[in-house]
Amino acid sequence: MKHKTCVSITEKNPNKLNSVLKKALTKSEYAEIRLDFMKPSEIPIALQNVEKKLSKCVCTLRPKNEGGKFSGSEKERISILKLISEYNPFLLDIEFNTLRNNQKLREYVKKSKTPILVSWHDFKKTPNMKNLNLKLKNMKKLSNFVKIVTVAKSTNDTSRILSLYNKSSKIKLIA
């Protein structure tokens, strides 16, 4: 299996994003653009500035309650996620809970043909294997691209997360 790298970009200025992204893509195959670090009103400008490079980008608009920096309302975030999908990035990272609770968003993104990276984070612990397997099973229903991030406090925690790769033969897993 060939591994690919993805560098994360947290540029706050939409006019500087293109040059930062260009540099990042000389060092890595892909780049994650953390659009949640920008003001909501500047995200459309940022997307226009990097439109030609989005085929190599994972776009993320993470809300504060999921560890992100997005400063707008959830309604505004959903609207911006739809806009991002229209630009057809390589992947659009959307949280499991957001997708599970918003069928209209799922349908909209599906129509745009932008692949979804369904993500889930636990910033306090690594759940037990039964719960991790259940989470993976439920996430796989929403996308072939799944990202699970937890806090590992022991080698056992790390082993549980890494063992998910054995259960992910038909999906692309990031853990």
Annotated model-derived regions:
Residues K2-L17, P63-K75, S119-K130:
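Active-site mouth loops of central-metabolism enzymes
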Residues K2-T5, K27-E29, K53-C57, N88-F90, ...:
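Short, well-ordered coil/turn segments that N-cap beta-strands
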Residues S8-T10, Y30-K39, T60, Y87-N101, ...:
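Catalytic beta/alpha-barrel core
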